[in-house]
Amino acid sequence: METLFQKTRVINGEPELIQNESIIYKVDNVSIYDGDQKTQYSNGTVMLSTHRVIWVNKDIGLGLLHQLILNIEALTTGLMGIGSSPKILITLTKRSFRLSFHAGRRDDFLKLYRQSLLNKPSQSPSPTSSTSQFINQPNNNNNNYNNNNSYQTPLQPPQYQQQQKEQQQQYNSYNPYQQQSSQSPQQPQQQYNSYNPYQSYVQQQQQQQQQQQQQQQQQQIPQYQQQTSPPPPNYYEHIQQQQQQQQQQQQQQQQQQQQQQQQQQQQQQQQQQQQQQQQHQQQQRQQSPSLYNSYHSTQQPLPPPSYLQHMQQQQQQSPSPSPQYQQTNSNSLPSQPPQPNYNLQNFINTPIISNNSNNNNTNINGFTSNAGIGGIINQMNKKTLENDKLLSESFSDLNILMEKAKDMVTLSEKLKVTLEKKTGTSTSTEEEEEFRSFLLEMGIESPVTKKTAKSKYHDQLSKQLSDWIITKNILKQHKGSGNNEMITLSDLYCIFNRARGIELISPDDLYRACLLFESLDLPLRLRKFDSGVIVVQSKDENDEQIAKQILDIINENGPLSAFDLAKINSISLHLAKDQLLVGVTSEKLGKLCRDETVEGNILYHINIFVD
């Protein structure tokens, strides 16, 4: 592999630079591949300079001049580039190799590498013998690689142009006398015997065909590759700008087409409406024939009734004319009946436009909008608009209520403090008790939410629930707990959600929060009876205390059933059965005995045998 690159001395981990050479970019953890095989030069540092690419390790340094490079491109290996490091393929005249970037930063290195190839110096150090050996080495690796991001350096001519130069040098260096002098005396005789007069003609035709092919290939090459000078530095940016402009033009054209289509649709709708109006007017004209025709068969419209009424009012208000004026008028009247100048038909067909702007049943064209399918659609649209207005107004009111909810909770806390101070001095009235219960229902000032607590939501919810149950005395004040400090999970869910107001929680969140009571060392615990009833009770509550309370009830009221216990303690029937029979029951403790009748009734008595 050392023959591929030019050896470079390494001093303290840095390569020895050439004159007027400077380092542009460095990338660590880079390996060199010879085709698909990984070489011994791995996990080194690649340095990009103004004249060459240098691979450096602790002991050795390898450099490759920019003048020898024909092509560089990004290479993707594996399935969609998954499971392999990004690579760069560097192609020379008769050989190629790869640089594998294990730590990334391949694209930045490739971008700067291309810029350095465009800006490489015109005079660079001549390659050593090792590089000439590398150029003459054959390329035995036929690699299939991706040509998506290929880059052809415009300063180096293609391979076919180099072959042409080599052939021309061979033709120019041809000397027939030199061959004759080196030949033996027997060779001229053999040449004369093997002389073919058509051979020179065939060679000329072959040369002409080669020249034509070369001209065709040069025409296919872009102009910037035929020129010796590199493309301008802003060439690629200019191409990108052109592409962006083309995309913008296409988008504008699409928008214009959409606007034109919308205009055409609107025009078609207007035409359809006009046709419907004309048909409606024709139907009205056919149904109402002309009421009065003149003697000369000239149909002229009559004045509207409002005009006639206006004229009559003016005549009544004006003073009566003089007799002379009446005589002249009576003399001037013709013997024939007056010829009407108007036709009532046109007056009937004219639309009656109401002055009331809220009248939505009539259109400007004189026919009702509720007629036909169009009228039904208009009514449906009106209803949807009204519903949208109602919803928007109601939601705006809800948003205002949600904003004011926190202020109401803080106010309730202040009032509660004042009431507690008052109860310390004097007795409370019924109104104060009702007001205190109302403040209890107002609930929590700043409830825990998933937005505020995030990953610690259930922990903080469990702590807040425990503090709220203890401070509000929920276990003692709840009617369903009786004398026992115990409440079912369903009742707790209803009370706690009512206290939270708007920020409601799900049953699953409440259950998870209750499960964390013991792990967070809180004074409550969650308990599940064999019947499936789940309750929240005090951590200090035990079975013996429950049994003692049941014994006291039996001593006062006599033998009782599960129904009687549920009625006395105001608890559910299932919870009463669980207290008597399952888990924490007094029967298992041996302090009660039961009497089962044939009818199925079960009564619990004090166990006199133990006493």
From Swiss-Prot:
Ranges for domain GLUE N-terminal: 7-94
Encoding gene (name): vps36
Entry's family note: Belongs to the VPS36 family.
Protein name as annotated: Vacuolar protein-sorting-associated protein 36
Keyword Cytoplasm: yes
Molecular functions (GO terms): phosphatidylinositol-3-phosphate binding; ubiquitin binding
Keywords: Coiled coil, Cytoplasm, Endosome, Membrane, Protein transport, Repeat, Transport
PANTHER family membership: VACUOLAR PROTEIN-SORTING-ASSOCIATED PROTEIN 36
Species name: Dictyostelium discoideum (Social amoeba)
Subunit structure of this chain's protein: Component of the endosomal sorting required for transport complex II (ESCRT-II).
Lineage of the species this protein comes from: Eukaryota, Amoebozoa, Evosea, Eumycetozoa, Dictyostelia
Keyword Coiled coil: yes
Sequence ranges of Low complexity compositional bias: 121-193, 213-228, 307-334
Compositionally biased intervals (Polar residues): 288-300
